[in-house]
């Protein structure tokens, strides 16, 4: 049995979407059991609409919930020990749940997860890893919004954790890594990015193949399995991709309605357009995983539909089923040992000289 705690009050639509999403996920996840956390009068009426959930869930009433516009510091101060978000995260800490899923306030979720679960010993800062549809297969991009700015060591940790997640999701032995930069040449970019590139290229680690720098237009091509960046750039890239996908969809709809001939052409090509929509739909892989914590927390889009939220639940389920946390801890320990040996032999000065 895989136990998933759900912040039922999270997101723009609350229980109407989160519980409906759980009902969809339950049909496809045979071993799932839900722990629902939320306000009694808001949750109970919705939960009664889904009798099939009653045998695979337990509802825990909470005093409060975290608003979408609440500042992280305020949400933590007011909601600690009281809110549905805090209790859902705390269930993972206490071993009552295997993963947590929330569509709530991103900043609050990051703050509560950080203070409740704490960081894995080998990491400095958490990152949000998102699944990204590409021309080849899905890629993982991190960080897409957890941190603003990152040191070379933090970028390297993101690379290792992203590789662990990719192998967990797609059952591959080796993962290719690229650092997002303003150019592919080694002399370009910020010093921290160049230092991270040197470490990843020099420290040999089984299961991780560093491919060098990639540019923003390479993400959608699927040039690498894992794209590593800091949260500011990663979040902008994500929002641009979402906006572009929406723009393409609207332009196609407009073109199809422009004349009777285009409408007829659309009818003949419906299956092809349906496949295109599925391919570029980021909601299909809705759910960013907070990596670097002593527990698995999945962040769904606040505006997610029930189907989208079920995708986030599926990701949380798969991460537990494939023992992501154990793989991350093992991989980080192993990589840090190899990195320490390299630095002891070569010294930090080697990295500094190569970035000049």
Curated annotation (Swiss-Prot):
SUPFAM superfamilies: Isocitrate/Isopropylmalate dehydrogenase-like
EC number: 2.3.1.274
GO terms under biological process: fatty acid biosynthetic process; phospholipid biosynthetic process
Name of the protein described by the UniProt record: Phosphate acyltransferase
Keywords from the named record: Cytoplasm, Lipid biosynthesis, Lipid metabolism, Phospholipid biosynthesis, Phospholipid metabolism, Transferase
Source organism: Bartonella bacilliformis (strain ATCC 35685 / KC583 / Herrer 020/F12,63)
Cell compartments where the protein resides: Cytoplasm
EC primary class: transferase
Family designation: Belongs to the PlsX family.
Gene3D superfamilies named in the record: Isopropylmalate Dehydrogenase
